[in-house]
Amino acid sequence: MNSLLLHCRPGFEGEVCAEIGEHAGRLNVAGYARAKPNSAHAEFVCSEPGGAERLMRELRFAGLVFPRQWARGAFVELPESERIGVLLEHLAAYPVCGSLWLEVLDSNEGKELSTFCRKFEVPLRKALGKTGRLLDDPRRPRLLLTFRSGREVFLGLAEPDNSAAWPMGIPRLKFPREAPSRSTLKLEEAWHQFIPREAWDLRLAPGMSAVDLGAAPGGWTWQLVNRHMKVTAVDNGPMAQSLMDSGLVEHVRADGFVFRPRRPVDWMVCDIVEKPARTAALIETWLGEGLCREAVVNLKLPMKQRHAEVRRLLERIRDGLSARGAKVSVACRQLYHDREEVTCHLCRLPAPA
């Protein structure tokens, strides 16, 4: 049980390997990362006993950028029949767990296994409960079974408060038919990712003011309007008429990189296709000058060296805000609905009393 399995978006396995390898080096956890292209997962194999557990103890999952989910454990080969008996034998070396998730990888093979997992979960859960291997206790580790095929599974453990909030790290969001574009789901997922659900009524409250830079046709604006915020939509392109009819949207035809609000707003959101360095400078201006209280901004990534680019951009943003004397929390994640991009959440911190 000394490997770390990390789920990711297909095509970003190299970024996961670079990111977890960098953290392991900093923490002096010996091992190596490996992955196959477009397999939707990577594995960090630790050379020392307890290495995977130490990595998960020392790192906060919320602080990782490219992994969607993680678990410590090992791959196990399964027979064509009597799979549950073999699993119970291996799980005898695992602690009693408080919850169970059956997961697949975000690949064509993974999608084909989804039906198998749904059917297999019922008898497996029953067997685990009968043998005392599974209790209903959120304080205990979660048992994560990631099936790479019907004959191979990763038996993993993760702490519920230090792993993904959803199986495979994929939120089950429904596309609202009224929204003018599917990009609307990126902003909704960002809120789920970065803002505790119990804080939504306070931090995403009706009547708040918001600016959407590069708004047309209004996918992100729709989310803001759906929370009954007053929105300034900045874009030279046309906005969906349904949003304009809401009475909550002012359409300003201007360059999103030039526009500045007359007074500070509660929220700024931005999903403009632009070089990430220019977008990072925009973040520094808006948060550094106090033009908004919170922001969700997408950074478009190059084709190569994407982990290194994200690290440089985050360092630049943090250094730039610090130089302006602004106290701002900065978080970054590649969301499920992101493509060749990552999403940043920034929040100005209250001045010390």
UniProtKB/Swiss-Prot annotation:
It is found in: Cytoplasm. Its EC number is 2.1.1.186. Pfam families: FtsJ (PF01728), RlmM_FDX (PF18125), RLMM_N (PF21239). One of its GO terms (cellular component) is cytoplasm. S-adenosyl-L-methionine binds at S183, A216, P217, G218, G219, D235, D255, D271. The active site is at K300. SUPFAM superfamilies: S-adenosyl-L-methionine-dependent methyltransferases (SSF53335). Keywords: Cytoplasm, Methyltransferase, rRNA processing, S-adenosyl-L-methionine, Transferase. Its main location: cytoplasm. The keyword Lyase does not apply. GO terms for molecular function: S-adenosylmethionine-dependent methyltransferase activity. It catalyses: cytidine(2498) in 23S rRNA + S-adenosyl-L-methionine = 2'-O-methylcytidine(2498) in 23S rRNA + S-adenosyl-L-homocysteine + H(+). The keyword Cytoplasm applies. One of its GO terms (biological process) is methylation. Catalyzes the 2'-O-methylation at nucleotide C2498 in 23S rRNA. PANTHER family: RIBOSOMAL RNA LARGE SUBUNIT METHYLTRANSFERASE M (PTHR37524), RIBOSOMAL RNA METHYLTRANSFERASE FTSJ DOMAIN-CONTAINING PROTEIN (PTHR37524:SF2). Belongs to the class I-like SAM-binding methyltransferase superfamily. RNA methyltransferase RlmE family. RlmM subfamily. Monomer. This is Ribosomal RNA large subunit methyltransferase M. It comes from Azotobacter vinelandii (strain DJ / ATCC BAA-1303). The gene is rlmM.
